[in-house]
Amino acid sequence: MIGSALVWALNNRGIDNILIVDRLGDDEKWKNLVPLQYADYMDADEFLDATKVAGDALGQVGAIFHMGACSSTTETDCNYLMRNNFAYTRDLAQWASSRHYRFVYASSAATYGDGSDGMNDGSENLYA
């Protein structure tokens, strides 16, 4: 949902040469893409594999907005969180940095909660 909101905002600025990278899975997230304008879609794991094999063949990159971390505060699979949130982000950031691409990483509300206690950087779960 957050990623599609970003694409919508970019579309409203006349930007549509966007490669959407995601794991759509079996739910109905794909419906968020229907009204949007973008150049292509690629599975997240296939994209990361492509950066390792043919990183420069992916085309011209203006910026990477990485919003792919699992922000669920109820996720308990530590292996999944480390693979998805840490390793994937690290590998993507290293690839972007090696090519001098702008890399924007989105944090989440999981870091700060609902704000009722102000900002607290204390970690209550593996994601935060």
Residue ranges and their predicted role:
Residues 15, 98-101:
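A short helix->loop->beta-strand "cap" motif at the edges of active sites that frequently abuts
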Residues 25, 71-72, 88, 110:
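Alpha/beta-hydrolase active-site loop signature
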